[in-house]
């Protein structure tokens, strides 16, 4: 549904911190499904870990938050160019169930739980080949920048 050029309109992140490659489904105000292709060419694997490359869990959480940001921006019909940004406000119930390694395509599925006074709450999961990798409840704050 959204390719990387469209995603860049809704997220202020750029290389090397843009974690979403494509959005495959988005229902405004409800849910988003996006993915990231994990490549051995990513710089993070030079240090995490050179002889046993594992994609860091904190970056999986960041990717979930970025998917939530795209959903929030699309739902509110805003972009960062409008002077708005979604900031990571909190996380609850994080669980890591499986390692993510080069060659994996990680799907992020996030659903809106609530949106009140600019604070959005999402239930999120990450999966590889249909297998649960990570789950978390993420909160983002819609704020004016500048």
From Swiss-Prot:
Substrates-to-products reaction catalysed: a (3R)-hydroxyacyl-[ACP] = a (2E)-enoyl-[ACP] + H2O
InterPro entries: FabA_FabZ (IPR013114), FabZ (IPR010084), HotDog_dom_sf (IPR029069)
Lipid biosynthesis among keywords: yes
Active site: 48
EC number(s) given by UniProt: 4.2.1.59
Major place of residence: cytoplasm
GO CC annotation: cytoplasm; membrane
Keywords: Cytoplasm, Lipid A biosynthesis, Lipid biosynthesis, Lipid metabolism, Lyase
Locations listed in the record: Cytoplasm
Recorded GO MF terms: (3R)-hydroxyacyl-[acyl-carrier-protein] dehydratase activity
SUPFAM superfamilies: Thioesterase/thiol ester dehydrase-isomerase
Cysteine disulfide partners in this protein: none
GO term, biological process aspect, one: lipid A biosynthetic process
Keyword field contains tRNA-binding: no
Gene3D superfamilies in the record: Hotdog Thioesterase
Function noted in UniProt: Involved in unsaturated fatty acids biosynthesis. Catalyzes the dehydration of short chain beta-hydroxyacyl-ACPs and long chain saturated and unsaturated beta-hydroxyacyl-ACPs.
Family: Belongs to the thioester dehydratase family. FabZ subfamily.
Protein name: 3-hydroxyacyl-[acyl-carrier-protein] dehydratase FabZ
Gene that encodes it: fabZ
């Amino acid at each position: 549904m959204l390719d990387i050029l469209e995603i860049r309109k809704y997220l202020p992140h750029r290389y090397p911190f843009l974690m979403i490659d494509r959005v495959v489904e988005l229902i405004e105000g409800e849910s988003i499904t996006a993915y990231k292709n994990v490549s051995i060419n990513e710089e993070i694997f030079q240090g995490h870990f050179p002889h046993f490359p594992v994609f860091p869990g904190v970056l999986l959480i960041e990717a979930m938050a970025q998917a939530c940001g795209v959903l929030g921006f699309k739902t509110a019909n805003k972009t960062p160019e409008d002077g708005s940004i979604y900031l990571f406000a909190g996380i609850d119930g994080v669980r890591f169930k499986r390692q993510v390694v080069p060659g994996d395509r990680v799907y992020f599925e996030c659903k809106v739980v609530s949106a009140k006074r600019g604070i959005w709450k999402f239930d999120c999961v990450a999966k590889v080949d249909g297998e649960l990798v990570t789950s978390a409840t993420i909160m983002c704050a819609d704020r004016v920048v500048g």
